[in-house]
Design a protein with these regions (language model features):
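Conserved beta-strand hairpin/beta-sheet module of binuclear metal-dependent hydrolase folds
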Residues: 1-43, 128-145, 162
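Structured catalytic core of nucleotide-sugar glycosyltransferases
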Residues: 5-15, 52, 57-64, 76, ...
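Active-site metal-binding motif and surrounding structural segment of the metallo-beta-lactamase
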Residues: 33-80
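Metal-dependent catalytic neighborhoods of phosphoester/phosphodiester hydrolases
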Residues: 64-74, 89-91, 224-231
Length: 263
């Protein structure tokens, strides 16, 4: 049985647990090691099953607890792009014992889970998202920190059974909010984040490709709220003919996991 469980999602930290029948992978470790291990225990995850930690990019809300976590889950290898691994090494975030793998165009395997990456547009060294090919044949994708939804991202996540996709900010809240103009422009740029409306616009094509589980993630604490993100997404899915109930599940990833597991 496959499952994806966002342990933390948002401005303060991000970490997602993906589990299959024979192993598990952790995507990002953006909170303290204790917080992540406590969250794993809360959702019934097993740190001993984690064969790999994959990192999307080197910003602190994705790597805060990385080094202590790798010192705890010593069996886990570290997978990321060559540019991100170089940035992590320079920042002293990789323990000496940890095996690192720079992922390229190939599909890697960890704990019986296939792992591929796709390029994303964000202001980091070499950011990426990931697709996970589960032992039961399901495909799970994680794509956050997207300045823009490119054809590369669309092609990679198409056909996913479940997608964790960024819905970072409400445009009106951001424009009217207290952030400096320069920061607002950075967030709205092609190297920033994906708005609720931009996220919602992508969901109908995902639905057509077979996606039935949608998780809205990385919501801004100051420039968004779950009801706005859900409303934008629900409207476009309904217009696209999505059925409710178990046929099409739409969730918002909470800042701290509330026990919700998808799939």
């Amino acid at each position: 049985m496959s499952k994806i469980c966002p342990l933390f999602s948002g401005s303060t930290g991000n970490s997602t647990y993906i589990e299959g029948a024979t192993g598990a992978v952790l995507a990002d470790v953006g909170m303290s090691c204790k917080a992540v291990t406590d969250a794993l225990q809360y959702v019934g995850g097993d740190i001993e099953k984690i064969s790999a930690v994959v990192i999307t990019h080197e910003h602190i809300d994705h790597i805060k607890g990385l080094k202590p976590f790798l010192n705890t889950a010593r069996q886990a290898m570290l997978i990321s792009t060559a540019g991100t691994l170089e940035a992590l090494e320079a920042a002293g975030k990789i323990p000496p014992h940890t095996k690192t793998i720079a992922i390229g165009e190939e599909t890697l395997e960890a704990g019986g889970i296939g792992i591929s990456r796709f390029e994303t547009s964000h202001d980091a060294a070499s950011p990426c998202g990931y697709c996970f090919f589960m032992p039961d044949g399901r495909k799970i994708s994680v794509c956050t920190d997207l300045g823009v939804m490119t054809d590369t991202v669309r092609g990679a996540v198409s056909g996913s059974d479940a997608v964790l996709i960024e819905s970072n900010y409400d445009i009106d809240m951001l424009k009217k909010g207290p952030y400096p103009a320069e920061l607002k422009m950075r967030i709205m740029s092609e190297c920033g984040h994906l708005s609720n409306n931009a996220c919602a616009a992508e969901l109908p094509e995902l639905l057509k490709s077979g996606t039935t589980r949608f998780i809205l993630g990385h919501l801004s604490r100051n420039n968004n709220n779950p009801l706005l993100a859900l409303s934008a997404a629900k409207n476009t899915l309904t217009e696209a003919g999505a059925a409710g109930g178990s046929d099409c599940i739409l969730e918002v990833a909470a800042p701290k996991n509330n026990g919700v597991t998808v799939l």
